[in-house]
Swiss-Prot record:
The chain crosses the membrane at residues 5-25, 35-55, 68-88, 99-119. Pfam families: CRCB. Na(+) binds at G75, T78. It catalyses: fluoride(in) = fluoride(out). Keywords: Cell inner membrane, Cell membrane, Ion channel, Ion transport, Membrane, Metal-binding, Sodium, Transmembrane, Transmembrane helix, Transport. It is a multi-pass membrane protein. This is Fluoride-specific ion channel FluC. InterPro entries: FluC. The keyword Endoplasmic reticulum does not apply. Coiled coil: none annotated. One of its GO terms (biological process) is cellular detoxification of fluoride. Fluoride-specific ion channel. Important for reducing fluoride concentration in the cell, thus reducing its toxicity. It comes from Bordetella avium (strain 197N). The gene is fluC.
Length: 126
């Protein structure tokens, strides 16, 4: 069910996360290495752990808080944070093969599909 406050929470959080990612890129992606992107991804990995942990400690917090911070803000900042949380969940459950497999497939798949997307765009531009 779409609750207007939830819809707003995701949108505002996503805008803030995207703006931060953009600002990090402007400030730090200047030396040939994407330090701003790395900061967004690694920071997002830390923040999703922190936020999910706090939400677990505070079940009384309303749903819009999680939606604004996790789905919105971290979704706008990076989807890498969700991936990190999922791998850690496998590790916490002792599913080391699943964790490794998911990490390898996610990274290799993302790199391959990025290359494929670039190649497709190149072909479309001919």
């Amino acid at each position: 069910m779409l609750v207007p406050l939830h819809f707003l929470a995701v949108g505002v959080g996503a805008a803030a996360g995207a703006w931060l990612r953009w600002l990090l890129g402007l400030k730090f992606n200047v030396s040939g290495w994407p330090w701003g992107t790395l900061a967004a991804n690694l920071g997002g990995g830390y923040l999703i752990g922190l936020i999910l942990g706090l939400i677990t400690l505070h079940p009384e917090w309303p749903a819009w808080v999680r939606l604004a911070l996790v789905t919105g803000f971290l979704g706008g900042l990076t989807t890498f944070s969700t991936f990190s949380a999922e791998v850690v969940q496998y590790l916490e459950r002792g599913q080391f093969g699943h964790a490794a497999g998911y990490a390898v497939v996610s990274l290799a798949g993302s790199l391959c599909l990025t290359a494929l997307g670039l190649a497709t765009a190149h072909l479309m531009g001919r």
